[in-house]
From Swiss-Prot:
Its EC number is 3.1.26.11. The active site is at residue 66. CDD domains: RNaseZ_ZiPD-like_MBL-fold (cd07717). Zn(2+) 2 binds at residues 66-67, 212, 270. The lineage of its organism: Bacteria, Pseudomonadati, Bacteroidota, Cytophagia, Cytophagales. It catalyses: Endonucleolytic cleavage of RNA, removing extra 3' nucleotides from tRNA precursor, generating 3' termini of tRNAs. A 3'-hydroxy group is left at the tRNA terminus and a 5'-phosphoryl group is left at the trailer molecule. The gene is rnz. It comes from Cytophaga hutchinsonii (strain ATCC 33406 / DSM 1761 / CIP 103989 / NBRC 15051 / NCIMB 9469 / D465). Keywords: Endonuclease, Hydrolase, Metal-binding, Nuclease, tRNA processing, Zinc. It holds the Pfam family Lactamase_B. This is Ribonuclease Z.
């Protein structure tokens, strides 16, 4: 099953040449999940031939404009293209009011259901139980309320070795084996053991999106062992003091977070427009965390191929 991340925008507060404001698209099988929606989001979707009609859920981290100013424009375009399927938006208090005011005064009547979930909990919470994935918030520390998001693939079924499968098992008992549960008869006698019949289930994959934040160890437990981690890195370490004052992170700090969290791979982004060249970010971070990648426009990453923690040392 596909589990692929597309980077649509990598700039911070203001866009710069070739770089746009925060927006990502996570493809899980045939479902599209959008994470933040900066001004150029719908343009970037079109540019990279990512079909906006497949987007079913949109997650907004916080109410700084570079993370949501493209949302109403995208919803309006979906409407113009005749969308009928519902869309689910998750975001902080106030975003639903902003959306409704913009739609009201532009006299836009959506022809599809828009469901809004307000994220008010200051701790981590389970916000979406989807057939393919569970989504949790990651409480971050920014100048205003801000959440990251953790996407965890649903546990995978065990695979059966059919040559070892007893012939007298019912479909219900076979389903039980696939869930990793041994099968016994009504007298408690063993009919089938998982360890003898099943091959180990593949590990479920995970992706964590850490938007604007200063480093705070309180969110580390929520990203522990994640396969793919996106962490903002607005500044290089030479501006660590400014990063702290503005509640942002440096490339060096992002790498230290990934190392502490024992992540598989790290993507860095949200680069300040003061930097034309992003290569120094990669050099700074990869000196601490080997498997670091620049999350620049048009890049994509598969959430798979787990890298061991030791290999990142």
């Amino acid at each position: 099953m596909d589990f692929e991340l597309f980077i649509l925008g990598s700039s911070s507060a203001t866009p710069s040449k070739g770089r746009y404001q925060s927006a990502q698209l996570l493809k899980i099988h045939n479902d599209y999940f959008m994470i933040d929606c900066g001004e150029a989001a719908q343009y970037q979707l079109s540019r990279y031939k990512l079909n906006h009609t497949k987007i079913s859920h949109i997650f907004i981290s916080h109410l700084h404009g570079d993370h949501f100013f493209g949302l109403v424009g995208l919803l309006s375009t979906m409407n113009l293209y005749g969308r009928k399927n519902p869309i689910h938006v998750f975001g902080p208090p106030g975003l639903d009011e902003i959306i409704q005011i913009q739609l009201k005064y532009s006299e836009t009547l959506l022809q599809f259901p828009l469901h809004y979930t307000t994220l008010e909990n200051e701790g981590s919470e389970h916000i979406l139980d989807h057939p393919l994935v569970d989504v949790y918030t990651i409480p971050l520390e920014h100048r205003i309320r801000c959440n990251g998001f953790l996407f965890k693939e649903k546990p995978k079924s065990y695979k059966l070795n059919k040559s070892k499968l007893p012939e007298d098992l019912s479909l219900l008992e076979i389903a039980q084996l696939k869930q990793g549960i041994d099968v016994y008869d009504e007298n408690g006698n063993v009919k089938a053991l998982v360890r003898e019949i099943c091959m180990p289930a593949l590990k479920s994959r995970s992706y964590a999106y850490c938007s604007d934040t200063k480093v705070n160890e309180q969110y580390f437990p929520y990203i522990k062992g994640v396969d793919l981690l996106y962490h903002e890195s607005t500044f290089l370490d030479e501006l660590a003091d400014r990063a702290a004052k503005t509640y942002h992170t440096t490339a060096k700090q992002a790498a230290q977070v990934a190392k502490e969290a024992e992540a598989g791979k790290l993507i860095i982004g949200h680069f300040s427009s003061r930097y034309y060249d992003t290569e120094p970010f990669l050099l700074e971070a990869s000196s601490i965390f080997k498997h670091t990648y620049l999350g620049t426009e048009g890049s994509s990453f598969y959430v798979s191929d787990r890298i061991s923690h030791e290999d990142n040392s």
